[in-house]
Amino acid sequence: MGKDNKEHKESKESKTVDNYEARMPAVLPFAKPLASKKLNKKVLKTVKKASKAKNVKRGVKEVVKALRKGEKGLVVIAGDISPADVISHIPVLCEDHSVPYIFIPSKQDLGAAGATKRPTSVVFIVPGSNKKKDGKNKEEEYKESFNEVVKEVQAL
């Protein structure tokens, strides 16, 4: 029983990587900078680790509120949102507050990485937002990958 579940997880992960090209036609024209296949995988892993440490804000309202409050981190935006007006203001807001942002091709992948069953349009990774003491170990786990991703995003 446990073995089947593991195999199911592995096939699910490989599916998301294989679907990168399949999801490209649905990406919005203003979705720039768009993550490459390799960076997309790295970003999703970082989101997954950050959500385990409870250091993510999900959804447009939460992300906009956090940006206006001046929190720092990384904004990950899904590039296949319809209608586009839902997220069109977020890149401008990020640039105003000098917060790095990146687009990824799929809202389904972003939702799955963010530990929700629903597709998610925007995720804001805010390191250190979890004030609990037990979150320290989990935070250290993803901090390194978070810093790597931020450097790559700023290079784009």
UniProtKB/Swiss-Prot annotation:
GO CC, alphabetical: box H/ACA snoRNP complex; nucleolus; sno(s)RNA-containing ribonucleoprotein complex
Membrane-spanning parts: none
Top-level lineage group: Eukaryota
Stored Pfam families: Ribosomal_L7Ae (PF01248)
InterPro entries: eL8/uL1-like (IPR050257), H/ACA_rnp_Nhp2-like (IPR002415), Ribosomal_eL30-like_sf (IPR029064), Ribosomal_eL8-like_CS (IPR004037), Ribosomal_eL8/eL30/eS12/Gad45 (IPR004038), Ribosomal_eL8/Nhp2 (IPR018492)
Family affiliation: Belongs to the eukaryotic ribosomal protein eL8 family.
Function: Non-catalytic component of the H/ACA small nucleolar ribonucleoprotein (H/ACA snoRNP), which catalyzes pseudouridylation of rRNA and is required for ribosome biogenesis. This involves the isomerization of uridine such that the ribose is subsequently attached to C5, instead of the normal N1. Pseudouridine ('psi') residues may serve to stabilize the conformation of rRNAs. The H/ACA snoRNP complex also mediates pseudouridylation of other types of RNAs. The H/ACA snoRNP complex mediates pseudouridylation at position 93 in U2 snRNA. Essential for growth. Directly binds H/ACA snoRNAs.
Database matches in PANTHER family: RIBOSOMAL PROTEIN L7AE FAMILY MEMBER
Name of this protein: H/ACA ribonucleoprotein complex subunit NHP2
Species the sequence originates in: Saccharomyces cerevisiae (strain ATCC 204508 / S288c)
Gene this protein is translated from: NHP2
